[in-house]
Swiss-Prot record:
This is Ribulose bisphosphate carboxylase large chain. Binds 1 Mg(2+) ion per subunit. The gene is rbcL. The modification N6-carboxylysine is found at residue 192. It is found in: Plastid, Chloroplast. Heterohexadecamer of 8 large chains and 8 small chains; disulfide-linked. The disulfide link is formed within the large subunit homodimers. CDD domains: RuBisCO_large_I. It comes from Saururus cernuus. Keywords: Calvin cycle, Carbon dioxide fixation, Chloroplast, Disulfide bond, Lyase, Magnesium, Metal-binding, Methylation, Monooxygenase, Oxidoreductase, Photorespiration, Photosynthesis, Plastid. The active site is at 166 (proton acceptor), 285 (proton acceptor). GO terms for biological process: photorespiration; reductive pentose-phosphate cycle.
Length: 466
């Protein structure tokens, strides 16, 4: 007699516990499960809980050396998805001790690791995570957060304006710096390295950093406003990434940038710590997110990637536009925008928020709206995102018929007009076009922009619906 019963047994006997009362310290997950035909939902949900925590495909002798009751993940609820015949939401609770403190990497390796290749499931999607304060408190979080950023930049009561420098690849460092200068002097707060711009043969990073710093200081002197350019520190190794951040700090610029998904959470968290220690703001780009979050039935919803970024650390993150050329349905986008900015977010299924999330005192992240937006979108963007956001117009600045600086002027005038109209109590949703038209009478730059983009729309159904 060996002391345990060998063999394969149903996961649901151990891992499906509908009576379980979740603890305040548990990490809770909501999975959208599509079982293979013939697999009951309880078994599928239990399999997810097992394979993402303590379980394996057969009972093992070493199970007797630990306490499964203390360490196992539990599927504590299953509900069918309305309008889908073979999809279920499985709720799984994970004991806190399964995770290394302060490591988004470890959290994801467990929760969205091997289980996503599991044969008994046709597809699996992580819709939301509840991060308990007991776990979130082990993370530094954003280097500075919204309030500190406003204080550093001395900009209040309005969204911030940015612009990605295009053409994204092929400019020399000197011409790139020139484009940055024109945008900043025209009235933008920030310009941005495209996420593809790292250090390529046509423009090495050190040269770009130098010419961009020159553009920042020249435009600051001219306008009397604090300016920034997101210098992309993303690199092939962590050491090289930190070296770039160090050079940015030596130049005295206010902000650097990182591609957090392609760069990886470990690198991102290291950079976020460096940024707080050295007074740099950190702008986060989400290149690769659509690989993970675009399919409705498999992968991870962006709200999970957004929560993970707030823990790993970043002061800005791209979050869709609701109105431009990229994905995003309004209520769902606003749901994760609140998860990024607010301290306490109530469960609200209509906005895709499966759990109440309490961030306690972790700083917030500014959502960045970027992609296919222009002056006519300004009232809608001001209305949807409010003051705590960064609105980024790449083509919408550089595509201006008179050049970058007038393009920047047009955007700044449009923004100031919208903010003023809102503060006067006007309804931006209804009177938006009128507000822009009025402002254009006083600004030839804005009038020219209004002329160019009057008809542009990207009309497709959003895929990210509930």
């Amino acid at each position: 007699f060996v002391g345990f019963k060998a063999g394969v047994k149903d996961y649901k006997l151990t891992y499906y516990t509908p009576d379980y009362e979740t603890k305040d310290t548990d990490i809770l997950a909501a999975f959208r499960v599509t079982p293979q035909p013939g697999v009951p939902p309880e078994e599928a949900g239990a399999a997810v809980a097992a394979e993402s925590s303590t379980g394996t495909w057969t009972t093992v002798w070493t199970d007797g050396l630990t306490s499964l009751d203390r360490y196992k993940g539990r599927c504590y609820g299953i509900e069918p998805v309305a309008g889908e015949e073979n999809q279920f939401i499985a709720y799984v609770a994970y004991p806190l001790d399964l995770f290394e403190e302060g490591s988004v990497t470890n959290m994801f390796t467990s929760i969205v690791g091997n289980v996503f290749g599991f044969k008994a499931l046709r597809a699996l999607r992580l819709e939301d995570l509840r991060i308990p304060p007991a776990y979130s408190k082990t993370f530094q979080g954003p280097p500075h957060g919204i309030q500190v950023e406003r204080d550093k930049l001395n900009k209040y009561g309005r969204p911030l304006l940015g612009c990605t420098i295009k053409p994204k690849l092929g400019l020399s460092a000197k011409n790139y710096g020139r484009a940055v200068y024109e945008c900043l002097r025209g009235g933008l707060d920030f310009t941005k390295d495209d996420e593809n711009v790292n250090s390529q043969p046509f423009m090495r990073w050190r040269d770009r950093f130098l010419f961009c710093a020159e553009a920042i200081y020249k435009s600051q002197a001219e306008t009397g406003e604090i300016k920034g350019h997101y210098l992309n520190a993303t690199a092939g190794t962590c050491e090289e990434m930190i070296k770039r951040a160090v050079f940015a700090r030596e130049l005295g610029v206010p902000i650097v940038m990182h591609d957090y998904l392609t760069g990886g959470f470990t690198a991102n968290t290291s950079l976020a710590h460096y940024c707080r220690d050295n007074g740099l703001l950190l702008h986060i780009h989400r290149a690769m997110h659509a690989v993970i979050d675009r399919q409705k039935n498999h992968g991870m919803h962006f709200r999970v990637l957004a929560k993970a970024l707030r823990m790993s650390g970043g002061d800005h993150i791209h979050a869709g536009t609701v109105v431009g050329k990229l994905e995003g349905e309004r209520e769902i986008t606003l749901g994760f925008v609140d998860l990024l900015r607010d301290d306490f977010i109530e469960k609200d299924r209509s906005r895709g928020i499966y759990f109440t999330q309490d961030w306690v005192s972790m700083p917030g992240v500014l959502p960045v709206a970027s992609g296919g937006i222009h002056v006519w979108h300004m009232p809608a963007l001001t209305e949807i995102f409010g003051d705590d956001s960064v609105l980024q117009f790449g083509g919408g600045t550089l595509g201006h018929p008179w050049g970058n600086a007038p393009g920047a002027v047009a955007n700044r005038v449009a923004l100031e007009a919208c903010v003023q109209a809102r503060n006067e109590g006007r309804d931006l949703a209804r009177e938006g076009n009128e507000i822009i038209r009025e402002a254009a009478k006083w600004s030839p730059e804005l009038a020219a922009a209004c002329e160019v983009w009057k008809e542009i729309k990207f009309e497709f159904e959003a895929m990210d619906t509930l």
